[in-house]
């Protein structure tokens, strides 16, 4: 005690001096009075072990309780599914519980929070199975996630099944709509797949299914596509067989009619939609091929025969190919087979109407379906616009009038069948009709009269602007030219006193002086004429500058005001000069000097007193 400095007390337990021993004693009493100083650090760890054991015990109990609950749920679900499913699917359910127990017991010793997460994940993964089984009656199996049937149904439209033989396609399509055949397929798939793929535990991943999936996809690609060049009778017979098989299978669901059909091309998801789409595609392809066969046999009559029936048959073949691809992409929703049939019949009855249809329409048969919902009046106006656009391209407007007056044109204007107007509507796909959309449309009965009234009103004021006349004819409002315009109105001749014509004067200069040009000016000289041309050039340049700067906001307003000021000054200058010309100039000479001023023919003298 005497060796230590003052105010230092030695702890009786740890033998260390402290300034405040009372604050240190509670900590030393917990260690114990008989513990040496060397072993203090090593003995502190066993003191925390009881706390860890107390924390780990309840967690294990919770994990075991959750595992038991999952086992009971799996047993209840298995007991419910025993009434509705075969035996081989029941064996797949107890596996998730075993995998869950292993996962929870192994992870419980390592971490405190991690064992709870797999249990919730397994609950989320196992519950949607029952809801999915309640929704679909045909797919009432737990092996849907493990067997590659579901993936095959998703990848089947991409493999190009609709292009193969229609009998094989219809038969393979019927496999997905029959419940007993699905059970047989499940047995075949379960026999071919290994056991680790059939399990539905939480440790299952997609990389185990990918090899089997790739093999099945290779099998799908190796399926023979069949002969695409089928006679129309065989195609129609195939469609009838598919329909009869569908009706028989819907009536008797318990019987298995297709036991020998290969299961590699089975469709299990949404069978009804696939049947409808496939039947529509088969109808479309059969009708297109029938049309091609009939066209090759009969050929196109009259002037189309000179063009060649083989080329048209090839075009129709390409058109049917495009129709097949459009049907495959759009799901056979906007296609109407009745339009193609009526078009074929109308071409057989009245072949001379095909001369009015452009040749490019054969490549655009897929756009005919979009015009099926339009009315007859709108289609007639579109037909008129097409004819006007063709005449405007060749600058032969009177030919359209002659066509309208001819009996063939009247037959083409009459709304006899939808296919005629649809075929004519396809010709409007050219860029010429895009500009024609801005023209005013009216019913085709009163179209010419309304256009004539508009022409009579709009031609007023355009008589002295011959450069606008070709553009006015290009509008195509009337099939003929305006009647109020004559040769003098097309080429107005403005003669100046000097004998030169003003036909080459700019449009803006003529618009500013068209009133004065009607009556030739009396006092117009060479200097004045050059001044007027200069003013016209300034005005033209000002308008060009104004159009470019008008978009700049405040600067455009200022330029506009200055331009008006300049125009007013030029007008007042010309008026004042004309008024002041006959008057004599006043002399500003001193009175002591006599000056004689001559201005033109007028002379005046100032005399001194």
From Swiss-Prot:
Topological category with respect to the lipid bilayer: Single-pass type I membrane protein
Residues covered by region (Disordered): 133-163, 406-425
Keywords assigned by UniProt, alphabetized: Membrane, Mitochondrion, Mitochondrion inner membrane, Mitochondrion nucleoid, Transmembrane, Transmembrane helix
Cytoplasmic membrane side: 572-609
Domain of life: Eukaryota
Extracellular side stretches: 1-554
UniProt feature, compositional bias: Basic and acidic residues: 146-161
Membrane-crossing segments per the record: 555-571
Compartment annotation: Mitochondrion inner membrane; Mitochondrion matrix, Mitochondrion nucleoid
GO CC terms, sorted: mitochondrial inner membrane; mitochondrial nucleoid
PANTHER family per record: HYPOTHETICAL LOC287798
Function: Critical regulator of mitochondrial DNA (mtDNA) abundance. Binds dsDNA throughout the mitochondrial genome without sequence specificity and controls mtDNA copy number by promoting its replication. Also plays important roles in mitochondrial metabolism and cell proliferation.
Protein known as: Mitochondrial nucleoid-associated protein 1
Gene name of the encoded protein: MTNAP1
